């Protein structure tokens, strides 16, 4: 609760400035190298600091995608996890790409067209919108779960509560 009860975290770090920068963007791209079939430790620490943004769905309405690089294994699983975190944040993902570079010196160059296609898909989602019924159901379930947190803290977090009311998530 030290970083979420009143919206002010006891950790003196760059996360508030980073959150403001992310809020000002149209889209979010999460990327991580793969270490032992998982995201990097730094990415995990960053995600842990996003708990408040997750609970209050601060990035709802944005679009995103995921990118992972690996020597050999775990890339697809990391892409799936990064997209899962995007959904937790209220973000609709347009997909992801994993590049395994281990024994293929040309893997990065070979993946360029897929990466460009993903970027175009993300830009198109920002420009024209994008819906995915399966993700919309996940986002609705997440909001239903986090609604109790917003209601419980409405007197401490009036701005967040009012945003949820404005979005129609609390009636």
Where are these regions (language model features)?
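Glycine-rich phosphate/pyrophosphate-binding loop and the adjoining helix
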Residues: 92-171
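Helix-loop-strand module that forms the ligand-binding subsite of alpha/beta enzymes
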Residues: 7-92, 98
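N-terminal beta-loop-helix "entrance" segment that forms/cooperates
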Residues: 1-9, 107-108
């Amino acid at each position: 609760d030290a970083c979420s009860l009143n919206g002010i975290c006891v950790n003196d770090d760059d996360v508030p400035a980073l959150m403001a920068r992310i809020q000002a963007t149209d889209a979010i791209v999460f990327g991580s190298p793969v270490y032992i079939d998982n995201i990097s430790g730094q990415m995990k620490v960053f995600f842990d600091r996003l708990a408040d943004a997750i609970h209050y769905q601060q990035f709802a309405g944005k679009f995103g995608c995921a990118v992972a690089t690996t020597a050999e294994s775990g890339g697809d699983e990391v892409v799936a996890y990064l997209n899962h975190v995007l959904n937790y944040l209220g973000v609709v993902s347009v997909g992801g790409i994993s590049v395994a570079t281990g024994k293929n010196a040309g893997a990065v160059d070979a993946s360029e067209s897929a990466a460009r296609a993903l970027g175009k898909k993300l830009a198109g989602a920002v420009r024209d919108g994008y819906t995915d019924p399966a993700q919309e159901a996940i986002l609705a379930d997440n909001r239903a779960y986090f609604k109790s947190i917003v209601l419980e803290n409405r007197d401490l977090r009036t701005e967040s509560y009012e945003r949820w009311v404005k979005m129609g998530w609390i009636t």
